[in-house]
Regions:
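A short acidic Gly-Thr/Ser loop motif
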Residues: 19-25, 89, 179-184, 204, ...
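N-terminal phosphate-binding loop and adjacent alpha-helix
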Residues: 39-81, 91-92, 98, 337-339
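Short glycine-rich, Thr/Ser-proximal phosphate-binding strand/loop in the N-terminal lobe
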Residues: 16-58, 332
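Glycine-rich phosphate-binding loops at beta-strand->alpha-helix junctions
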Residues: 25, 297-318
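Adenine-nucleotide phosphate-binding core of ATP-dependent small-molecule kinases
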Residues: 245-288
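Short beta-strand-loop/turn "lid" adjacent to the catalytic site in phosphate-handling enzymes
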Residues: 73-152, 192
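Glycine-rich phosphate-binding/hydrolytic loop that grips phosphoryl groups
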Residues: 280, 317, 331-359
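Glycine-rich phosphate-binding loop plus the immediately following alpha-helix
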Residues: 46-55, 137-245
């Protein structure tokens, strides 16, 4: 935990909080009336605890402790906090309260209008109003079945991140496609009105973790402990192209096996094998572009990439080489990615009137 910025004294009288509840870790940011972060607290608690335990009581208790400790360490009391705002999986069935998704297209106006305020200690056991930002689901037919499943997708949390993106980077040419890399890869179409038209999601990040932890290929892509930074600095277009070619001609499942052969038979070093597996997954990931037309997403427009540095680099290389699509912005530094969520939450709260006297 630590102080991020100094408070502005008598000029700024009001404080509010942003709760960023992840899968395994959560963060609470305390902001002043000028929307400056003055303190940040973290705790190992997340929605995974609900999934594992079958109850959200541990999550509620952990978030309560984190919230109260962060407020206290910021030199404030709970009565100083006007409200807290949150988004993401905390609004799902394994969070604090399940909040229905908004229909796409939706932008900052729709998200602000859709805020669900709650002050109920059985939901969030702190005596502070909690504002839930709703996720967004694709626009698909009301009578959709599995036959239309390719049109169906949703997000929780990324809508806030994307509003932060268009707020912090107003110069981005509209419309554009944003791609975020985390436990999933998610593609988002942003229209000329800065609305989210919809999303397409793959399980790429979790697939990599499963391969790494649960298959014998994992041994072939593991490097020395603590060498992720060294790997992030390595890039060889020839390796990336070889992986793309393998997926294209031999298929995704066989390409996933190839780092094993590269280790045992070819004696390639671990970082080449790791780059190959990452490029293999991203090559398969790019097949999602085939469904852009189905959802009415523009195909030949600029891309913005957000997330892990190496995945962004591989994706950018393949996107430009094989699809001729330009990447106009990359946001890879963790503090800059975190800032998207903060600025997005602030922008939505401000649009809803919570930063100018709304109770």
């Amino acid at each position: 935990m630590g102080r991020v910025a100094e408070d502005g004294g008598d000029i700024i009288k009001m404080y509010f909080a942003i709760i960023d509840c992840g899968t395994t870790n959560s963060r609470v940011y305390i902001l002043n009336g000028a929307a400056e972060v003055i303190y940040k607290g973290t705790k190992q608690i997340g929605v995974k605890d609900t999934a594992v335990n079958g109850s959200n009581e541990i999550l509620k208790t952990g978030l309560k402790e984190l919230f109260e400790n962060t407020v206290r360490e910021a030199g404030l009391s709970l009565k100083d906090i006007k409200f807290a705002i949150t988004s993401g999986m905390i609004t799902s069935e394994i969070g604090l309260k399940e909040i229905p998704h908004l229909w796409a297209p939706a932008g900052i106006a729709e998200l602000a209008a859709g805020i669900t305020p709650v002050q109920d200690r059985t939901i969030f056991p702190v005596d502070v109003p909690l504002l839930f930002i709703r996720g967004i689901k694709n626009s698909y037919p009301a009578n959709a079945t599995y036959r239309e499943i390719r049109m169906v997708d949703f997000m929780r949390g990324e809508e806030t991140q994307l509003m932060g993106l268009v707020t912090l980077y107003p110069e981005l040419p509209l419309p554009f496609t944003a791609v975020t890399f985390s436990s999933h890869t998610k593609y988002f179409s942003i229209n000329a009105a800065k609305q989210i038209v919809g999303s397409l999601t793959t399980i790429s990040g979790q697939l990599f973790e499963a391969i790494k932890e649960r298959t014998f290929v994992g041994k072939s892509i593991a490097g020395p402990d603590g060498d992720d930074e060294q790997y992030d600095d390595y890039f060889d277009p020839a390796v990336v192209e070889a992986a793309y070619d393998a997926v294209l001609h031999a298929g995704f499942l066989r390409a996933l096996m190839m780092p094993r052969f590269m280790e045992v038979l070819l004696n390639d070093p671990w970082y080449i094998r790791r780059l190959f597996i990452d490029a293999t997954i991203i090559a398969e990931d790019l097949r999602v572009l085939n469904d852009f037309n189905l959802l009415g997403f523009p195909e030949d427009i600029n891309f913005v990439l957000v997330g892990y540095k190496q995945r962004c680099r591989i994706f950018k290389y393949l996107l430009q080489k094989y699809y001729g699509i330009k990447v106009v912005q990359e946001i890879v530094a963790k503090d800059q990615v975190d800032l998207l969520n903060i600025r997005g939450a602030v922008a939505i709260a401000a649009k809803a009137g919570y930063l100018n006297g709304k109770e």
